[in-house]
C-alpha cells in the first residue's frame, strides 16, 4: 500500500458552478494533507469545466484532475463512477473525500465497490492518526454516539462528508498548481440512463446546506401550525425554514427541514432558533453558524449559552414585532 499517496476530493459542480461542499472538503483535505506531507488532488468531471481548475487551486488543490467528455455533461452514476475509478487506479490516491450530497451519496459507494475498498458515510469529523490512517467520525445509534472508523487494510480510504460541517477553504489566488487532463474510456454503452430533459428544482425544495439565513422552530412553537409564523419570518428575511428533531419526530414538519446531528449540519450567516431549548444534538448541527439568535420564553434554556443574541419572551409575540420592523427597513 506504499504506492498510494495524496488526498483527493471529488470537486462536485453543477451547471459549471462548484458546490459549497466541494470547497468545504477541499479545506479539510488541505489540513489532512499538510499533516501527512502529501498533495491535495481535486477531481473535476464534466464537459467544458476546465475553467474551474484555477478556482480549485486557489482554494487549496495542488493538482486538478480534469475528466472532460460530452457524455459527462450531466451526472450519471455509471459515467462518473467509471471515470473516477479509472483515475484512481491510474494515480492511486490514499484518500478520496466526497460531499454527502445526493450525488456524492450515490457515487461514492459505487466507486468503493469498483475499487474493493471501504466507505464511511456522513462523516462530521476527519483526522489523521499516529500511523497516518484516516480517522472518520460520524454519528451512530440515532446520534447518541459518535463512532470513529478506520480502514487500515484497503486503499483508497473513502468518506462522504456532510455539507456545512467543515469550514470553507480560504481563497488564495497566488497559489500555483498543476492541471492533469485524463482521458477516461467512457462510451455511450457504459451509460444505461439517458437524460431526456432537465426540470429545475421547485422553489419550495429545502436546501438548508446552501442557505445564508435559516429560521428554525422547536417544540416551543406548540404544533404544526406554529411553523406558519416561522415561515413568515424566514420569507421576510429571504431565508429558509429549519426544524428541531422533536418537531420532525412529532410529525409537525418533514425531515428535510431537520437541523442537527441526525439531520443536516448547516453553517448559515444567520441562524434564528425559535422555541428551541438547545439539545446537544441540535447544537451539533448549527453551532458553526455566523450569528445565532435565540428566542425562548425560558431564560435558562441552554440555547442562550451559544447564542450571540438572545430574546427572552413568547415567540408568538416577539416574531410579529420582528417581522414588522424588518418590513419597515425594506
Swiss-Prot record:
Transport in keyword set: yes
GO molecular function: electron transfer activity; flavin adenine dinucleotide binding
UniProt keyword annotations, A-Z: Electron transport, FAD, Flavoprotein, Transport
Domain of life from the UniProt record: Bacteria
Alphabetized SUPFAM superfamilies for the sequence: Adenine nucleotide alpha hydrolases-like, DHS-like NAD/FAD-binding domain
One annotated GO biological process: fatty acid beta-oxidation using acyl-CoA dehydrogenase
Cofactor(s) for this UniProt protein: FAD
Entry-linked InterPro entries: DHS-like_NAD/FAD-binding_dom, ETF_a/b_N, ETF_a/FixB, ETF_alpha_N, ETF_asu_C, ETF_asu_C_CS, Rossmann-like_a/b/a_fold
Record's cofactor remark: Binds 1 FAD per dimer.
Alphabetized CDD domains for the sequence: ETF_alpha
List of residues binding FAD: 270-298
Protein family (similarity comment): Belongs to the ETF alpha-subunit/FixB family.
Complex and partners: Heterodimer of an alpha and a beta subunit.
Entry function: The electron transfer flavoprotein serves as a specific electron acceptor for other dehydrogenases. It transfers the electrons to the main respiratory chain via ETF-ubiquinone oxidoreductase (ETF dehydrogenase).
This protein's name: Electron transfer flavoprotein subunit alpha
Lineage of producing organism: Bacteria, Bacillati, Bacillota, Clostridia, Thermoanaerobacterales
Amino acid at each position: 500500500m506504499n504506492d498510494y499517496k495524496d488526498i483527493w476530493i471529488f470537486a462536485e459542480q453543477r451547471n459549471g458552478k462548484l458546490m459549497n461542499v466541494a470547497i468545504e472538503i477541499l479545506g479539510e483535505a488541505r489540513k489532512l494533507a499538510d499533516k501527512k506531507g502529501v498533495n491535495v488532488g481535486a477531481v473535476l468531471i464534466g464537459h467544458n469545466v476546465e475553467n474551474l481548475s484555477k478556482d480549485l487551486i486557489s482554494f487549496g488543490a495542488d493538482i486538478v484532475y480534469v475528466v472532460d467528455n460530452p457524455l459527462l455533461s450531466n451526472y450519471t452514476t455509471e459515467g462518473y463512477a467509471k471515470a473516477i475509478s479509472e483515475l484512481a487506479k491510474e494515480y492511486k490516491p490514499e484518500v478520496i473525500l466526497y460531499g454527502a450530497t445526493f450525488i456524492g451519496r450515490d457515487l461514492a459507494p459505487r466507486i468503493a465497490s469498483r475499487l474493493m475498498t471501504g466507505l464511511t458515510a456522513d462523516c462530521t469529523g476527519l483526522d489523521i492518526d499516529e500511523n497516518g490512517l484516516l480517522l472518520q467520525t460520524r454519528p451512530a445509534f440515532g446520534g447518541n454516539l459518535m463512532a470513529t472508523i478506520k480502514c487500515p487494510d484497503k486503499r483508497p480510504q473513502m468518506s462522504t462528508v456532510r455539507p456545512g460541517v467543515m469550514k470553507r477553504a480560504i481563497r488564495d489566488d497566488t497559489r500555483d498548481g498543476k492541471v492533469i487532463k485524463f482521458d477516461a474510456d467512457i462510451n455511450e454503452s457504459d451509460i444505461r440512463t439517458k437524460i431526456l430533459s432537465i426540470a429545475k428544482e421547485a422553489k419550495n425544495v429545502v436546501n438548508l446546506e446552501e442557505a445564508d439565513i435559516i429560521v428554525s422552530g422547536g417544540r416551543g412553537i406548540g404544533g404544526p401550525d406554529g411553523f406558519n409564523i416561522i415561515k413568515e419570518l424566514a420569507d421576510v428575511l429571504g431565508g429558509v425554514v429549519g426544524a428541531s428533531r422533536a418537531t420532525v419526530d412529532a410529525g409537525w414538519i418533514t425531515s428535510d427541514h431537520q437541523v442537527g446531528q441526525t439531520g443536516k449540519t448547516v453553517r448559515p450567516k444567520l441562524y434564528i432558533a425559535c422555541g428551541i431549548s438547545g439539545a446537544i444534538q441540535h447544537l451539533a448541527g448549527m453551532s458553526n453558524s455566523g450569528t445565532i439568535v435565540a428566542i425562548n420564553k425560558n431564560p435558562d434554556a441552554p440555547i442562550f449559552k451559544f447564542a450571540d443574541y438572545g430574546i427572552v419572551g413568547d415567540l408568538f409575540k416577539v416574531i410579529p414585532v420582528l417581522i414588522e420592523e424588518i418590513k419597515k427597513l425594506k
